[in-house]
């Protein structure tokens, strides 16, 4: 079966056979003219292309010249939509080319305290800009040349924990229930968000860890940070108490803004009772500043700008003096108590802290646990350290049961009666 191309070729051959010599010469001249016209068009297009390349090269050199550092730093104040068709035309008025432009215009404020209206934005796509963005502008034309990273207080940047903590839940003894509650409230919403969505449950925003000193609150927070791939910000309550008015609130605001940018994120606020005490009437400006800092924290936890991808872990020894507004549901939803360890937990803690030590097999940790009534986790660690130091003093190669007993006596002698204040 013949193809369509073969049929066309046969048809053209038949036409050529039917044409006279003069007709063939005339057709060939027409083809030569068409070829010459196409070559001239191609030559003209190549010349135009070379001209455009030259112009592009010149413009790129001008842009490179204008983009030379240093930039003038500015903030986007407002982004406006320009539509010149809506404006009434005035007869006899000069034509302003900028006013005829369609699209987005920008109002920005520079670091020299000037407010500038830009009908032409510059080298940045205006769709990628929003009010409050930090931009670099040309110091003469004020055209936006580049977007700059958000500005944060240097103290807030120092709060970010760069090195991932090495602690694990296996390093914490006797707190299985507390570990489970913390995992449910903080870790699961970050690692298995779909399980909460399937049940229609909104996970807690924050967790309060409270209990006597040395019971493992900070250790638990470090283990939680190690188990998730989230950014970890560590704040201390006294850090947020600043001398100047509004400085502490700005630190809280910047910390949550940095957390939002690096979400998912865990913010750990240690010793929250430094800023979270109950509000009272006071004429002292320092007390009012502490209360303002706490109000900013309340707003960030449960305000219009709150973010579910940011979790807060707060720790304190004095939960009884915290403000009720901080403790209510929707802010620090889950309260986890860290009591003094039980006898079984004390034995487990002693085993954890002595597992890297060369311990004599005859050491009875259950008996040691019965001898350490009312000891907290930190004191049990001190017992292991003291036992190791006593063995070192004897030039021994392993730590014996007697060393642990002597360590308990030394730590018990250093115990302060004032610790009962936290119980």
UniProtKB/Swiss-Prot annotation:
Q: Which UniProt keywords apply?
A: ATP-binding, Cytoplasm, Nucleotide-binding, Nucleus, Proteasome
Compartments it resides in: Cytoplasm; Nucleus
A GO CC term? nucleus
Q: Pfam families attached here?
A: AAA, AAA_lid_3, Prot_ATP_ID_OB_C
The record, for InterPro entries, names:
26S_Proteasome_ATPase, AAA+_ATPase, AAA_lid_3, ATPase_AAA_core, ATPase_AAA_CS, NA-bd_OB-fold, P-loop_NTPase, Prot_ATP_ID_OB_2nd
Q: Name one GO molecular function term.
A: ATP binding
Would you say which domain of life the source belongs to? Eukaryota
Gene Ontology biological process terms, A to Z: proteasome-mediated ubiquitin-dependent protein catabolic process
Sequence positions that bind ATP: 211-218
Family to which the UniProt record says this protein belongs: Belongs to the AAA ATPase family.
The record's PANTHER family line, in alphabetical order, gives: 26S PROTEASOME REGULATORY SUBUNIT (PTHR23073)
Q: Report the function annotation for this chain.
A: The 26S proteasome is involved in the ATP-dependent degradation of ubiquitinated proteins. The regulatory (or ATPase) complex confers ATP dependency and substrate specificity to the 26S complex.
Q: What is this protein called?
A: 26S proteasome regulatory subunit 6A homolog
Query: Whose protein is this, by species?
Result: Solanum lycopersicum (Tomato)
């Amino acid at each position: 079966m013949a193809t369509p191309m073969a049929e066309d070729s046969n048809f053209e051959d038949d036409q050529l056979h039917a044409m006279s010599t003069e007709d063939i010469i005339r057709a060939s001249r027409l083809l030569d003219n068409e070829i010459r016209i196409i070559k001239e068009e191609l030559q003209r297009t190549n010349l135009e292309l070379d001209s455009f390349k030259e112009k592009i090269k010149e413009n790129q050199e001008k842009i490179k010249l204008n983009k030379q550092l240093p930039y003038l730093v500015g903030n986007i104040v407002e982004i406006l939509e320009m539509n010149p068709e809506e404006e009434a035309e005035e007869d006899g008025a000069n034509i302003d080319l900028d006013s005829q432009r369609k699209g987005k215009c920008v109002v920005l404020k520079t670091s020299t305290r000037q407010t500038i209206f830009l009908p032409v934005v510059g080298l940045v796509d205006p769709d990628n800009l929003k009010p409050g963005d930090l931009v670099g502008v040309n110091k003469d034309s004020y055209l936006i040349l580049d977007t700059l990273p958000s500005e944060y207080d240097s103290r807030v940047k120092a709060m970010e924990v760069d090195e991932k903590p090495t602690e694990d839940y296996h390093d914490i003894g006797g707190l299985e229930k507390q570990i489970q509650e913390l995992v449910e409230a903080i870790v699961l919403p970050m690692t298995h968000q779909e399980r909460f969505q399937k049940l229609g449950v909104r996970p807690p925003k924050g967790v309060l860890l409270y209990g006597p000193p040395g019971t493992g609150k900070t250790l638990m927070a470090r283990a939680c940070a190690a188990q998730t791939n989230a950014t970890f910000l560590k704040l201390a309550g006294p850090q947020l108490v600043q001398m100047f008015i509004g400085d502490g609130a700005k630190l809280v605001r910047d910390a949550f803004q940095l957390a939002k940018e690096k979400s998912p994120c865990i913010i750990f606020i240690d010793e929250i009772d430094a800023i979270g005490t109950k509000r009272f009437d006071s004429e002292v400006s320092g007390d009012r500043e502490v209360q303002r800092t706490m109000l900013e924290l309340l707003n960030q936890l449960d305000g219009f700008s709150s973010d579910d991808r940011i979790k807060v872990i707060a720790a304190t020894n004095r939960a009884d003096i915290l403000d009720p507004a901080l403790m209510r549901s929707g802010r620090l939803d889950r309260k986890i108590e860290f009591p003094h360890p039980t006898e079984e937990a004390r034995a487990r803690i002693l085993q954890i802290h002595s597992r890297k030590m060369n311990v004599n097999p005859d050491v009875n940790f259950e008996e040691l646990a019965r001898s350490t009534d009312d000891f907290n986790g930190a004191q049990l660690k001190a017992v292991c350290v003291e036992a190791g130091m006593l063995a070192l003093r004897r030039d021994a190669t392993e730590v014996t049961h007697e060393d642990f007993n002597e360590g308990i006596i030394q730590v018990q002698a250093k115990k302060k009666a004032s610790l009962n204040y936290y119980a």
